């Protein structure tokens, strides 16, 4: 029988983030102690009022509009306009089963080339590969807070020589946990060259200091804002995300609606109705407590690992760190991460999965291996956190960091 799988698809591997989680679970079943620092999932419960809204609407069983429930689209537009000072209307919003699907369909639609900062989230590049879009990487470094400079972006646009291009910009960043500080300068270059920006703002509500700033404020006509419930609302398994697309990109939006109709049809009705509660109710206390915990845990990991053998940028949002290890033993970050897992039980994702050159000893560390329900329940309100709280409610983080520190010092 001839091969029934297309050659292109046969070259793909499972998503690195999902693969490391499955590998960790297999090791745990064999009796090995594993510190699950490889999988990025919010450890916190969905806010009670949002859960109750889902229960209340569980009987909703009709197909909804391919673009999404109009009431939900309206409240998301208002939410963005209030929090980000945007000017979106309900017709600018498209609801999807997570932003990942919407990004994939956008890659299929887009007639041009893709610009990705390295590091970037693990699925941008494979999606571009499937869609047969050429990817242009911009290598960044800790000195630029793991974001590209405006000059780097302009040089890359010029090298593409007149082709349409789209820049994926994720802040707070997965995998580095840093926040982009040069949005205005990037926006000026994008506007000058009519570059489309896909602003992946899934972690925006988990910015630790100050109010989150969106690049859409500086370049509204060319920026697609992408976000959803998975990170700030602890609802990764609910699979609800959205795109906010400016009227100037009407053709892209209309094409995306067509692909939505020919793929997932519409997002789960009960989830969409429950999401109205998420975007209209006051979740400020919940978010304050969640950010307090994440900031404390992230800074604990940073302070205990940052040294002359491990270089890390201070966490600014989300729940990741991107340590760079100093050693000459390994030829690739993949080899290094396998050694760490084998010798310490600490599961990390190699920097090469995020577009970083293999010979750079970088890895993503997700500091969410703890019971967020207990941590949140017992430390909410004005309670100031200390290391005793960490040892009590996040022992895997404490022990895993100790193991990783011991491993790094062995070199």
Predicted features, each with a name:
Residues 3-97, 280-281, 374, 388-393, ...:
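N-terminal small-domain helix-loop-helix segment of the aminotransferase-like
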Residues 116, 137, 197-199, 350:
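Hydrophobic residues in well-ordered beta-strands that form the structural core
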Residues 142-210:
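Active-site phosphate-binding strand-loop segment of PLP-dependent enzymes
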Residues 158, 339-348, 354-411:
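PLP-dependent enzyme catalytic core of the Aspartate aminotransferase-like
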Residues 221-292, 303-304, 387, 401-402:
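Conserved core segment of the aminotransferase class I/II
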Residues 276, 292-302, 312-325, 361:
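Conserved glycine-rich beta-strand-loop-beta hairpin in the small C-terminal domain of fold type I
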Residues 109-128:
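Conserved PLP-anchoring active-site segment centered on the Schiff-base-forming lysine
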Residues 27-30, 131, 189-193, 308, ...:
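Helix C-cap/helix->beta junction micro-motif
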């Amino acid at each position: 029988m001839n091969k029934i799988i297309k050659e292109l698809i046969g070259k793909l591997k499972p998503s690195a983030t999902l693969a490391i989680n499955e590998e960790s679970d297999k090791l745990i079943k064999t009796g090995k102690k594993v510190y699950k620092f490889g999988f990025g999932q919010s450890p916190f419960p969905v806010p009670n009022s949002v859960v109750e809204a889902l229960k209340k609407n569980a009987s909703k069983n009709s197909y909804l509009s391919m673009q999404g429930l109009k009431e939900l689209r309206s409240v998301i537009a208002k939410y963005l306009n209030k929090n980000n000072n945007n000017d979106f209307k309900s017709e600018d919003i498209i609801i999807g089963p997570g932003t990942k699907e919407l990004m994939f369909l956008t890659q299929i639609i887009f007639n041009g080339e893709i610009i990705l900062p390295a590091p970037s989230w693990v699925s941008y590049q494979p999606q571009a590969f499937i869609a047969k879009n050429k990817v242009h990487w911009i290598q960044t470094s800790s000195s630029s807070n793991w974001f590209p400079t405006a000059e780097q972006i302009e040089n890359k646009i010029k090298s593409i020589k007149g082709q349409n291009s789209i820049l994926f910009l994720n802040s707070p960043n997965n995998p580095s946990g840093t926040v982009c500080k040069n949005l205005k300068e990037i926006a000026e270059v994008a506007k000058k060259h009519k570059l489309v920006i896909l602003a992946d703002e899934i972690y925006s509500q988990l910015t630790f200091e100050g109010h989150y700033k969106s690049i859409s404020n500086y370049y509204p006509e060319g920026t697609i804002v992408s976000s959803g419930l998975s990170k700030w609302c602890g609802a990764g398994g609910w699979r609800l995300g959205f795109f906010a697309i400016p009227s100037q990109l009407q053709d892209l939006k209309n094409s995306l609606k067509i692909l939505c109709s020919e793929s997932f049809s519409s997002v789960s009705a009960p989830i969409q109705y429950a999401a109205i509660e998420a975007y209209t109710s006051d979740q400020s206390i919940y978010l304050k407590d969640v950010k307090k915990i994440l900031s404390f845990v992230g800074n604990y990991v940073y302070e205990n690992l940052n040294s002359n053998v491990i270089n890390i940028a201070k966490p600014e949002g989300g729940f990741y760190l991107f340590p760079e290890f100093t050693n000459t033993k390994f030829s690739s970050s993949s080899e290094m991460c396998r050694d760490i897992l084998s010798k310490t039980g600490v599961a990390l994702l190699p920097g090469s999965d995020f577009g970083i050159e293999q010979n750079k000893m970088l890895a993503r560390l997700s500091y969410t291996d703890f019971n967020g329900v207990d941590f949140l329940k017992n430390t909410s309100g004005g309670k100031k956190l200390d290391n005793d709280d960490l040892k009590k409610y996040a022992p895997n983080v404490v022990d895993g960091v100790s193991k990783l520190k011991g491993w790094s010092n062995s070199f």
